[in-house]
Amino acid sequence: MNAAFTSKLKHAALAVIGLMLCSCTNLYYYGPAGAMGGTRYLEGYNPGDVRYSNQQNDTESWWKGDEASGAPGIVISLRQQKAYYYKGGRFVGMSILSSGDDQHRTPVGSFTIQQKDRHHQSSQYGDYVDASGQPIKQNIDRKIDPMPPGAKYDGANMFYFMRFTRGIGMHAGFLPGYAASHGCVRMPERMAANFFNNVQIGTPVDVRN
């Protein structure tokens, strides 16, 4: 992606973000999905949080990327909690998201897609399970939670994972309507799939406040 296109992409993103400021306070919730297992670290699910009592549908995300051609690019707005997808400099898709919380902020800067893994699992967050796969201890952090005797680690699912720096990437997950992750960028599954299928290793990702 040349400098002229990058500049065009950034200016277009700023214009779109400015037009959408009025919608940044809407809350969204996806899940829990039974197939996701016990852990909710990466999905941001907290069954004790009253904000989860009313489920809402995603009425903002949209996709026309399959109809466009050209080099892809992504702009992520942490303030808006939205990801903007471009092809050939054209704005052709947008997804709501949930980025890192105050203790695990999503890094800001210019990155590129470094890894794609459709069935990725976290190496740090998940559950300790027994030999049959039944949870012994859920929602664990391997860095601080010791493994019980006889248990094994089962990493949290991060489907359609698109790594753009270190352990941080975009992936499908629950969205509570605010920044709630451990640094990753969670998206509705259908939008994560759209982005995943339309990026390559090296696709630029611009993360901004």
Features from the language model and the residues they span:
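N-terminal pre-domains immediately preceding structured catalytic cores
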Residues: N2-N209
